[in-house]
Regions:
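Short loop/turn segments immediately following beta-strands, especially the blade-tip
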Residues: 75-83, 130-132, 190-193
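Short, conserved, GDST-rich strand-edge loop motifs in beta-rich repeat architectures
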Residues: 3-27, 114-121, 168-183
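Blade-level signature of beta-propeller repeat domains, shared across WD40, Kelch, NHL, RCC1
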Residues: 151-193
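Predominantly a core beta-strand signature of beta-propeller blades
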Residues: 40-43, 86-89, 136-140
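A short loop-to-beta-strand structural motif that recurs across blades of beta-propeller domains
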Residues: 30-33, 71-73, 126-128, 182-187
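Glycine- and Gly-Pro-enriched alpha-helical subdomains that act as flexible
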Residues: 56-79, 83-87
Length: 193
């Protein structure tokens, strides 16, 4: 297969912002970056993160997860300057049940689904639908037997909304694996229209 052919098959994410993480999950050396598709340039927008995860960009606002300090932060994104301005925490870190990981917007964009990665010795996992305006938890999902919820994906079909959750098993101690038999499973939650 030619190089040009492979490139033609690649799908690009329209979100021009991505984050990095410290592999040891201990030091705030990660950052949020902007990728300019036209110039193919990358520039740092905001540093000092430990594990930049879920993102949602809409109408000049960016919601970003930094997992280790347990923050879900809203920023004003100035695309002309390529700058981020922190505005507020969506919810206080102490209110979050575990480490926030992946995030996806719900239809309409007024709330997001947040998946929580729990490294503790617990059996079940949690994900929440959080209203962006005030941090209120609208829906809580319990994923039985799988404490490390990583990535939600929201699908709309025939007027109904479904949420898919991926979960992790990598690095899970055997004693936790014994009480979490569904770790690594994909879960589906159907929501009413």
């Amino acid at each position: 297969m030619s190089r040009e052919k492979r490139g033609a098959e690649i799908q690009t994410d329209p979100l021009p912002i991505f984050g990095t993480k410290h592999l040891g999950f201990r030091e705030p050396v990660a950052a949020l970056y902007h990728y300019d598709h036209a110039t193919r340039q990358v520039r740092e927008l905001f540093g000092g993160q430990t594990c930049s995860n879920g993102k949602y960009l809409r109408d000049g606002l960016l919601v970003d997860i930094d997992s280790k300090p347990k923050t879900i932060t809203e920023y004003r994104y100035d695309s002309a300057l390529g700058a981020l301005h922190p505005l507020r925490l969506i919810a206080p870190p102490e209110a979050l049940p575990a480490l926030p990981d992946g995030m996806r917007p719900m239809p309409g964009g007024k709330s997001v689904i947040v998946a929580y990665y729990n490294p503790a010795h617990v059996a079940d996992g949690i994900a929440q639908e959080i209203r962006l305006s005030d941090g209120e938890v609208l829906t809580e999902f319990v994923l039985p037997g799988s404490p490390r919820v990583t990535c939600p994906e929201v699908w709309e079909r025939d007027g109904a909304t479904c949420v898919f959750f991926t979960t992790a098993i990598e690095g899970m101690p055997e004693e936790t694996r014994a009480i979490a038999p569904e770790a690594g499973t994909i879960f589906v939650a159907g929501l009413t229209a």
